[in-house]
Amino acid sequence: MEWASVPEVRKKAGVSEEDYTDVEIQEFISWATKEVNSKIITRYIRERIGFIDSYRSNKIDGSNTTYFVRNWLGKYLADSNFDNSIDVSDIKVVKLDRSTSTESEVVVSSINSKACSFVLSEAPSNCELYVDYCVTSVDPITPDSFLWQCTTYLAAGTSLVGNDGFDVKFGNVSIKPGKDGGKGKQLLTEYERLLDQLLVNINGGTAYGDMAEKI
């Protein structure tokens, strides 16, 4: 789950393999994906699992293992631990036995981002279930154009801009200050504009604006 490609970032930044290797560009993309993800997710902690509707009954009856989060409408389960992957590590489920006042974590076997559902390794009974998770209003698996563009511009801009005279490090990548900083600043400004529009779209505001291709 990384929302940019090495060729597109190279094209936007105007850098060659002599400037950055593919591995180094990929590190910019990985960092940019985490950063954009942090702007579009909403976190829910210890949400009690219970009946939602006839399809999402969330029965705790000793036979059911599939459950849905309450905040599912128009949402997708998201990357909550910022490893650029959406998997079972992004959800935590605990069961509470009121009779003994004991609590234990339940193993999650699989998750479905689009359905906002998850499958447990066991069918719980006689307990309460609670879940920690994150959701986003933008499909993180097949990202829309704004999500892709935001990440591309952020990765490209970051590859060109230093920070107050000091080297900036992202993983194994070291950015030297002042390297074509004018264009880098332009790219980051465009990223901020695209991110603002993306957040407006997510919050149900204006229709999609024009994509930026001029820089």
Regions found by a protein language model. Give the residues of each.
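Short, hydrophobic/amphipathic alpha-helical patches that form generic packing surfaces
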Residues: 149-164
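Conserved short "hinge" loops at termini or chain/domain junctions
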Residues: 1-68, 73-148, 162, 189-215
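Protein-protein interaction interfaces in oligomeric scaffolds
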Residues: 170-189
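Short, flexible active-site-proximal loops enriched in glycine and acidic residues
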Residues: 166-168
